[in-house]
């Protein structure tokens, strides 16, 4: 789970996933499928998880600033899908801090069924 000041809109092109978004005064997992649209306001805690065995492809509408972040931390789609290395995780943490993103703790994530390994900057 994380938050940042930039709003994000997601239009699902392929695959199925769940998105944790603010709903009813709390957070709730919402299932989304191709053709679905999700709006995440700026500073809202949110998360995504792929609940299928297929890749999920989104069209993301956001700020140019967030686009720069994705460019800096992303990996080419042509690269084989592998877990990030410790170096890649460290770079992601560093860039997240530079952009002012808040990454939720392992305990906060666990409360919503997300298990993240402990790591630090």
Residue ranges and their predicted role:
Residues 10:
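Structured binding elements
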Residues 1, 5-6, 16, 20-121:
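Jelly-roll (double-stranded beta-helix
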């Amino acid at each position: 789970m994380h938050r940042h000041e930039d709003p994000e809109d997601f239009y699902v092109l392929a695959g199925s996933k769940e998105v944790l978004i603010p709903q009813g005064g709390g957070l709730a997992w919402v299932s989304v499928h191709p053709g679905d649209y999700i709006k995440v306001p700026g500073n809202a805690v949110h998360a995504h998880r792929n609940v299928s065995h297929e890749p999920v492809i989104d069209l993301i509408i956001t700020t140019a600033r967030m686009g720069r972040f994705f460019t800096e931390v992303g990996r080419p789609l042509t690269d084989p899908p592998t877990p990030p290395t410790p170096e890649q995780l460290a770079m992601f943490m560093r860039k997240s801090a530079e952009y002012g993103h808040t990454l939720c703790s392992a305990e906060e994530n666990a409360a919503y069924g997300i298990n993240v390994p402990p790591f630090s900057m």
